[in-house]
Amino acid sequence: MSLLTEVETYVLSIVPSGPLKAEIAQRLEDVFAGRNTDLEALMEWLKTRPILSPLTKGILGFVFTLTVPSERGLQRRRFVQNALNGNGDPNNMDRAVKLYRKLKREITFHGAKEIALSYSAGALASCMGLIYNRMGAVTTEVAFGLVCATCEQIADSQHRSHRQMVATTNPLIRHENRMVLASTTAKAMEQMAGSSEQAAEAMEVASQARQMVQAMRAIGTHPSSSAGLKDDLLENLQAYQKRMGVQMQRFK
C-alpha cells in the first residue's frame, strides 16, 4: 500500500458516511494525484462543509496544506488553527511539545506513527497544530504518520461507540437505528438509480421505503416492525443491479 493510499484510508475512516464522504474522497484523490493545486479554494470549500466536526476539518485542512504546493507566505486558516489547539488544554500542549521533539528525530512514516500512537488524540491534534502554525518542522512523511495515528485514535473511539449502539438491547434504539439505516439505503438507491428508464422501479421501491419509515415515525410503531427493512431494500437493489448487468454483492 502506498503512503498516500494509507493516508487517504485513515483520513476517510473518521468522515461520516454519506454523499459528503464521497466528495471528500474525490478531493483527496485529486490532491494526491496533483490534479488540484488551488489550496485557497480547497480550504474555502472545506471550511463551509456541513456535518464535519471541527477536528475532522482541521485534520483535512492539515493534509491539504501538507500536500498542495503553496507559496511560503500563504495565510494559515483560523478554522484549522482552532481545531488543532488541543481544546486549549495546557497539558495537551506540554505533551504535544514532547511528542514533537521525538518526531523531529524520526524520518519514517511508520516510525512516526508508532511513536504518536502512545499519545492521546488531544496531544496529537496539538502537535499537528504546532507543525501547521510553522512553530515546528518535520518531514512530510513524519507529518503523515502523525495524521494517521490521530485518525486511528479517533476511529477507535468511534468504533467503540458504534459497537455499543449496535449491541444495545434497548428495543427503541434498535428500532430507530434500523429505520435510519433503511432510510439511508433508500437515499443511496435513488442516487445509484440515476435517470435511466430502467431505474423507475428502483426509484419507486426507494421512495416507498422512505414513505414507510416516515409513516412509522409519525404514528409510532412496535419496535419489531422495522426488522428486516434494510435487508429487503438491499435485496431489491441487488435484483435491480442484476437486471442492469451489474454484479455487486458487497452491501450487506
UniProtKB/Swiss-Prot annotation:
Residue ranges of the region described as Membrane-binding: 1-164
Domain of life from the UniProt record: Viruses
Residue span of region RNP-binding: 165-252
Topological type in the membrane: Peripheral membrane protein
Record keywords, A-Z: Host nucleus, Membrane, RNA-binding, Viral matrix protein, Virion
Any GO BP annotation: viral budding from plasma membrane
Cross-referenced Gene3D superfamilies: 1.10.10.180, 1.20.91.10
UniProt GO MF annotations: RNA binding; structural constituent of virion
Subcellular location: Virion membrane; Host nucleus
Function: Plays critical roles in virus replication, from virus entry and uncoating to assembly and budding of the virus particle. M1 binding to ribonucleocapsids (RNPs) in nucleus seems to inhibit viral transcription. Interaction of viral NEP with M1-RNP is thought to promote nuclear export of the complex, which is targeted to the virion assembly site at the apical plasma membrane in polarized epithelial cells. Interactions with NA and HA may bring M1, a non-raft-associated protein, into lipid rafts. Forms a continuous shell on the inner side of the lipid bilayer in virion, where it binds the RNP.
Annotated family: Belongs to the influenza viruses Matrix protein M1 family.
Other known facts: Most abundant protein in virion. When expressed alone can form virus-like particles in transfected cells.
Name recorded for this polypeptide: Matrix protein 1
Source species of the chain: Influenza A virus (strain A/Memphis/1/1971 H3N2)
